[in-house]
Amino acid sequence: MMTNIWHTAPVSALSGEITICGDKSMSHRALLLAALAEGQTEIRGFLACADCLATRQALRALGVDIQREKEIVTIRGVGFLGLQPPKAPLNMQNSGTSMRLLAGILAAQRFESVLCGDESLEKRPMQRIITPLVQMGAKIVSHSNFTAPLHISGRPLTGIDYALPLPSAQLKSCLILAGLLADGTTRLHTCGISRDHTERMLPLFGGALEIKKEQIIVTGGQKLHGCVLDIVGDLSAAAFFMVAALIAPRAEVVIRNVGINPTRAAIITLLQKMGGRIELHHQRFWGAEPVADIVVYHSKLRGITVAPEWIANAIDELPIFFIAAACAEGTTFVGNLSELRVKESDRLAAMAQNLQTLGVACDVGADFIHIYGRSDRQFLPARVNSFGDHRIAMSLAVAGVRAAGELLIDDGAVAAVSMPQFRDFAAAIGMNVGEKDAKNCHD
């Protein structure tokens, strides 16, 4: 039940600097690879959000020793087949990454397990991982329409030659992990760009994989060893404050230590194509990942047409991109959005409804949206709905900097799924985002 409401107020300027939280995708993968490694791994910059804590809790239930002291998470790995049978179903909460990646590991174990989640997660499509895992020899029983709960009877797997039907990093990573635990060689034929954190991180644990054009080759039977990892700042999290700075008057914001992996950086390119002044300073590498300090200035934006090849690379940032589009002069068109309908919510429908509530004209189809932007945009004061989706909640909070009055956001606290520090970061640059109990709010 929704028990809180966020409220926002417009701003006359934004300024300041923040060091953004650790990357969520990398935090998941670091925990999973560390658990499969032999020896101890130390992770610095781990993102302790609800999604990543679901992965941590599941690994603990599988017998992995995970400790946190100040800013360092220590994992004592158990090797490929050292996980222990869980005593109860493993609850992945709202985390699709946790469920899909862990399924690839559990399919190769020698015990039975069940992966479940909240109402939202148990509606999300799982056939994309079930089909190839079954081809590898897995036994997985799902709910109707290939959704969770997933009942997994672990057994030896065999490598396969498989063409990925969509550019999904979760699917790709699930099969890389399963391939490591399988007999023989797994060849994955990719289609389009998806984030490559698993491929970059695996060699840091001593793992090997061969990457050719549109092909990833994984050989089973390797051994991983513990290491020390620094998690870069989360670009998806930084995107909210980038857009806030672009659309707020008299804004100059610095965001430190942001990962700028080219398979994640489409949001930067798209905002720059709209006319956004975004500068990358002090570019360097943390381990295998490129990092920069990002400086963003208020800019007059213009509408653009987003080419289909950008969508997979920017899928998580599209809700906040829609807010930028509403403040851009002219029409923005985004197509190829079928995947946006099967995220934590139907993000296409949810964002369209909220934009219309805020006074933004938009046309929505099965997999596209036209947003009719205005450079003098002032969002209408209104009560809007996060639909229980963290990225929608934070996108609406950013819209508050350009509203004509107060915005009320139902269930804003769902932001903790990926960024529990959102309101702290917002306050640090001058945004006004508060919280009140729902029973004290009225339409």
Curated annotation (Swiss-Prot):
The active site is at residue 316. Its main location: cytoplasm. Pathway: Metabolic intermediate biosynthesis; chorismate biosynthesis; chorismate from D-erythrose 4-phosphate and phosphoenolpyruvate: step 6/7. Phosphoenolpyruvate binds at residues 24, 96, 124, 170, 347, 391. GO terms for biological process: amino acid biosynthetic process; aromatic amino acid family biosynthetic process; chorismate biosynthetic process. Its EC number is 2.5.1.19. It is found in: Cytoplasm. Catalyzes the transfer of the enolpyruvyl moiety of phosphoenolpyruvate (PEP) to the 5-hydroxyl of shikimate-3-phosphate (S3P) to produce enolpyruvyl shikimate-3-phosphate and inorganic phosphate. It is an enzyme of class 2 (transferase). The lineage of its organism: Bacteria, Pseudomonadati, Pseudomonadota, Gammaproteobacteria, Cardiobacteriales. The keyword Disulfide bond does not apply. 3-phosphoshikimate binds at residues 24-25, 29, 168, 170, 316, 343. It catalyses: 3-phosphoshikimate + phosphoenolpyruvate = 5-O-(1-carboxyvinyl)-3-phosphoshikimate + phosphate. GO terms for cellular component: cytoplasm. This is 3-phosphoshikimate 1-carboxyvinyltransferase.
